[in-house]
Amino acid sequence: YCVNVTAIFIDIVGSSNITDERKRPTLAKMYRAFLSECVAIMNAEIDCKEININGDCVWGVFDTPYKSDIDNVISVAAKLNSMIKILDYKLRKKNYSEISVGIGIDYGRALMVKAGYSGSGINDVIWMGDVVNSACHLCNKAGRDYRKVIVISDVVYNNLNEHNQGLFSSYSDGWVTRYEGDIINISMNDWYNENCK
């Protein structure tokens, strides 16, 4: 069935270069830390209906029937961005190079389909629709080519409260206006400042 949702994607920028410069055990630990922390942050939200991992990309689908729910997804993005700051500190301490990420967010209708083969044990919920594709596309622009870490669609921006709108600036992406920001979670940032010196 169709439902209005907000999709968020986060992936590591330049991950193919990371595999070239790191040994496999180190790479596995770094990816495991990144993926598990992203999943934990998304999974902690009651509105999160689905989390998927594709390579170095983690994406979630959030049930957002109210505008305040969309603001909550922005706070998830801020937590993800703050978590990367902490993870980079841990990587620096071990003399590993830091990682950077892109986060893309969009809102719209998605088709939820249960797909698989009966009796095979493969019977997953699949989320399809422009909102999922668009959030993935925005993620691929975020954190690259002078873009800030978080890129959101105009639909997401227009549904945010005034405070959250003030955290983003607009830019033109062809004929479309997008919004970008580098927002953080204040309490996580305070913890970072106290513990990561």
Language-model features: locations:
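Juxtacatalytic helix/coil linker segments
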Residues: 1-29, 36, 40-45
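Short glycine-rich beta-strand segments
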Residues: 11-13, 104-110
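Short helix/loop segment flanking the catalytic signature motif in cyclic-nucleotide metabolism enzymes
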Residues: 23-26, 53, 57-98, 105
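Catalytic/regulatory signature loops of cyclic-dinucleotide turnover enzymes
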Residues: 106, 130-155
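Switch/connector loops and helix/strand junctions flanking conserved nucleotide-binding motifs
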Residues: 111-115, 159-162
